[in-house]
Amino acid sequence: MNKLKSFLFSLSLLLSYFSLNAQISLNVDLIAAIDRGDSRYSGSWVYVDPLGQEYALVGAKTGTAIYWLDNPDGMENEVAFIPGPSTNWREITVIADKAYVVTDVQDTDHSMQVIDLGALPDYANLISSYDDTFDKGHIIQKDIFDDSPYVYINGTTTTSGVHILDISDPFEPVEVGVYNPGYYIHDCHVRGNLLFAHAFFEPGTDVVDISDKSNPTFLYRIPDPNGSTHSSTMTMDGKYLIVANEQDGRDAIIWNIEDPNNLEAVATYTANNESLVHNPYIKGDFVYIAHNTEGLRIVDLADPEVPVEVGFYDTFEGPSGGFSGLWSACPYLPSGRIIGGERTRGLMIWEWEEHRAGRVYVQLVDSDTQSPIFNADVIIGQDSLLTDDQGWARWGNLNGTFSAVIQAENFFPQTLNFSITEDQKDTIIVVLESSIVPTKASLLKETFSFAPNPTKHQIQIQAMQAAEWRILDIAGKVLLTFVKSSGNHTINLQNLPSGTYIIQAVTAHNRWNQKLIKQD
């Protein structure tokens, strides 16, 4: 009996261990966590030397620590440390063999440090400091996919805007332009000739033309009426922008920005709505997110309108929410290793076992009319989706078998069982049967009618009871919807092209359909 109790206790511990670890990570392995003894860590970036050896740079409380990741003895050891002003916020970027570092500390002579990395792994050294036009910077950025000789500093004391520095001569950086809208810019994202400036205390992100860096020009704003816009990254094709907000409970928003005159928020993402999405970084079809208390998150954006989390490593053991956990992440090493700055644990290095999401696109249609069913519920596990105006619900996950409960007003519910395969897109049409008890056609004909038919411009409808009226095309797509009380009403059809349509009246218990012909 004692042996049995001991076995059960050990089994319980084993199951608890695997349960706990299942919550800590998915498809991501921690290679190393290096705490050099500083009390705080923040920004991080990477460098690859001419021999292909990889390095990680991380902002520590008292300076910038540099680690050699390809040390032959297998240890990721610190090979250089460049002191700087003591701060909780130190940000880094790298262009060619120079690192550029800013700190959010005023009244220092190290507003932007320039560090030569060319002699690594033997040593690195500070070669210049820039303080001509600002004395602190909260964030420094570059065009991640173009090593053009420019850096962009945000959150300075002098303008609160974005300072553009030419670092062609890293010993003598020169400010060539400033985007100064008159309000605070917290961070920015740069791609080609576009600057996305995050106006933290204003309602949105400024999109700025920087083709002439001496004269940054405001183009338009991506709205965010709730403010706290923090950072962003653009998909590789330039069609979508992922915008993060530095506020607990705010999801990242994915915007379709192809047409500045028709901006559309197409999806949102969060790993936990009690936490905030801090900094996103795009690489290929994936966005790598420093998610504060939720750690590193990797999201498949092969279809940006259906973002799917495919990997994570939770770095923080405490409760969700607030300004703890993972500050930064950097996925740009050729080896595929990912590094990040964890606020209290230091440099973290991961390997990711790449997996792509599969997606399913479900359309609900009416069995009687073949028209799409909108505002229907599609419930998959803990996810609850609403069908759009064309009856579509879209969902994704890693490989597996799933079940969806489908519910729509005036239709019998259905359960849909389906499988998802990695990197596959499947379309499923679900036909729902009406739950409305049919009334004899002769009675419906007396209840609803319209004339003339065919018509050129308008029709007169006669209804003995209130109904929702719809005009559908012959494929069942809803073109017009309007609610009318009982009585006689005029419906203007001038904007419809000539053709054959279906006119439909829907009440709580009945649905009436009739063919309608529109002529020129």
Model-flagged regions — what are they?
Residues 1-25, 439:
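Bacterial Sec-dependent N-terminal signal peptides
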Residues 409-433, 518-520:
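Structured interaction patches on ligand/partner-binding surfaces of diverse proteins
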